[in-house]
Amino acid sequence: MEALGDVAETADLLRYSCSRMEANEGFAIELGRDPLTGFESSNVSVLRPYGVWVVISPFNFPAALTGGPLGAALVAGNTVVFKPATDTPWTSRLIAECLRDAGIPDGVYNFVTGPGSTLGQAIIESPQVDGITFTGSYDVGMKIYRDFGSGRWVRPTILELGGKNPAIVSRHANLEDAAVGIVRSAFGLQGQKCSACSRVFIEEPVYDQLVGRIVELTNKLAIGDPTDRQVYLGPVVNKNSYRDYQQFSEDLHQNSRILTGGKVLLDGMYSKGYFCTPTIAVDLPAGHKLWQQEMFVPITTIAKVKNLDEAMVRANNVEYGLTAGFYGAPEETDWFFDNIQAGVTYANRPQGATTGAWPGFQPFGGWKGSGSSGKNSGGPHYVQLYMHEQIHTLVRHA
């Protein structure tokens, strides 16, 4: 099911970039005319492509997180080199075939695959590269940012990095909406989304009731073959993620109270993949590292708070600022939007507390350690990131 959305969103991202270029008439804007005696002047702002743009995409949405930046870069007039994650190269290969079949000339798009430590590093270090978009982990993104900035001049770097995404629940919330939205965001795609809900802060008066409902819904989630539409969780992507889940679970068993999950599945069909149970942990000390660290597996920690101000302080007390959700009274939502430090924010959304992005509806991007550009993918300001401005001033004798 996630793959169906990934492909559909890719098509819409490509259409959206094209529509923004057309709606803005190529981003050529006539400016003021200088008041020069005896002369006529004109000034025009134009946006021009940078040249060669690199797109490095992650495994979790290999179509949309390749096609989105690739499409924007191409529409802006750049040539593109794109390298997928080593776990999911075939999806990007299919995108390359679609571009070929659409008639885009050879050399305008260039699909390459290989390890990030060798091929990826060589691309980043190439002086022929004029800009880069990387979607992935904070640590790798920051290394790319530093390495890419060590050339002869400053080159644009668009980073879409991780998240440690909170949901805040007020005592005035619709608790069923909150429970459904939190579970969907925490465990969709096995928690392997940068937008996954990994932290929940609940006001004390509704804490017990809501936690009970979250656990109840979590226990109903089907785990198995991800091609079966009745299944909600498939396996995590690889052995490293499997080991991460086991290490985090062991830590939580020692330092928190696990209400459900906290173990891998080994019997029967589960022996054929990296299957993990969706995990809810409570009573984790506020200073514990797992409140800060992006886990990227199906684990969510929940805390009781005395009031919304405490919840907001804890929600913002991380290096990340990607997505965030809130459940409460309508009059409380402005407070949430005004104070939360995140690029994509949701209020009273049962479809997902912290997840859900679509071009032209919920453009996707982060603040702080979650993103570098300040402009969200699939939004009205995104395609411009792949161009630089040039001013044309022309003066004629009157």
Which functions belong to the PLM regions below?
Residues L4-G5, L13-Y16, Q362:
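Catalytic cores of nucleotide-enabled group-transfer and carboxylate-activating enzymes in metabolic
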Residues L13-R15, A23-D177, V305, S373:
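Rossmann-like NAD(P) dinucleotide-binding subdomain of oxidoreductase/dehydrogenase enzymes
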Residues L13-R20, I56, A73, C98, ...:
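Generic, well-ordered alpha-helical scaffold segments in large soluble proteins
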Residues R20, I56, P115, T135, ...:
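Conserved residues at the C-terminal ends of beta-strands
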Residues T79, R257-I258, G321:
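Residue-level detector of anion-binding/catalytic polar loops
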Residues G103, E125, G131, D139-P285, ...:
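ALDH superfamily catalytic-core signature
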Residues I104, Q128-V129, I168, A222-P226, ...:
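Conserved C-terminal structural/oligomerization subdomain of aldehyde/semialdehyde dehydrogenase
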